[in-house]
Amino acid sequence: GFGPMEMTVAKGKRCSAAGAYLRPAVARGNVQVLCNSLVDKVVFNGTRAEAVDFSLHGTTHRVKATYEIILCAGSIMSPVILKRSGIGPAAELAAHGIPVVADRAQVGENLMDHLELYLQHACLQPVSLYPTQGLLAKAMIGLQWLLTKRGLGATNHFESGGHVRSRAGIVYPDIQFHFLPLAISYDGKSLTKGHGFQVHVGTKRSKSRGFVRLRDANPASLPKVQFNYMTHPDDWLEFRACIALSREIFNQPALAGFAGPELAPGPYVIKDTDVDTFIKQKVESAYHPCGTCKMGEGDEDVTDPQARVRGVQGLRVVDASLMPQATAGDLNGPTIMLAERCSDLIKGKVLPAANDAPLLVSPNWLQAQRSWDMTHDYANDRDSLRAALLLNAQNCISNGENPQLDFSKN
């Protein structure tokens, strides 16, 4: 479905997890935050975690735990700290001279991320944010925000979006759209000197997997991070669907008076080879790494369903690295939810009974799909492409039904 996007904005300001949770906790007086400190490792007595070694302003410190240690360093650094502490693949630890506390092969594996790219159109009507790009306009927006915390400075402008299924046989949406009323890249450059708009679109369940590994045992050294983006063939099919479905949206009758020429990838990027080249050049990270300390019930999983690190005692991980599969939406909200749930587990809070109300699923998810056929090769077949776009431009989505298209009849 499509609708307004949720934002973490409070009183006109971006609201971080630190602002919502950490600063109020510090104000209570029972939390001490040491900024500019660098954690080296967790110290064990046998397999019991009992202390943390860290440096602050060039001095090494050790702080002992009364009950347990909770590691919240994120999907890149949590597995790195575990490995420096002796928890990880035995061969990798031995290669860096680190004594093995627990041989856990999956620490640092299963690295996932969300990728996206954007399609841009010129806009036929003067309704985009293009006039705000001048210095005077930016100054006025900034002044309004400083005085009132309202206006264009109080939003990220991705105010609408959607989630769809890329093809039949997928139960839940696997493609996400973010719409922006401006044609611009993240570096501030624009393909047009005028009004435009764009959609940021990407897959949410990539099958590609990467890893995080040690460069050495020095806590100041950066780790080796390899995402292995687009290494699974299904990722290419799904991103072709992203582009096709975005074009379908921009060819809807409701946008006929607004959608001008396609700026990116461009109207002549149709062949699969050309589309793949565009994907390769333009796809980029949404900065949602997760999965490297995978939670699960299997013995091979890094953490158990209580977020406890397997093979040792007194150590938990609480961050997005726990996710066994990337969520089908952005990670900020799910990560906060995960942390709240783990907080209840750590405190031993008795939770209410689970609400097992059935999730809404399209009744014909096995058969229904958009008219774009992911198995069809569009190389040298622009007639089929035009027929597909034309058909979808003539058919509005109604009652949750998706129109079918048999290319053999066009």
Task: List where the protein language model places each region.
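Conserved redox-cofactor binding core of oxidoreductases
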Residues: 1-49, 55-57, 118-142
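FAD-dependent oxidoreductase catalytic-site/capping-region signature
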Residues: 3-5, 124-127, 141-334, 342-407
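Active-site acidic short loop of glycosyltransferases
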Residues: 28, 65-67, 312
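Glycine-rich loop(s) and the adjacent beta-strand/alpha-helix scaffold that form part
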Residues: 42, 51-142, 151-152, 217, ...
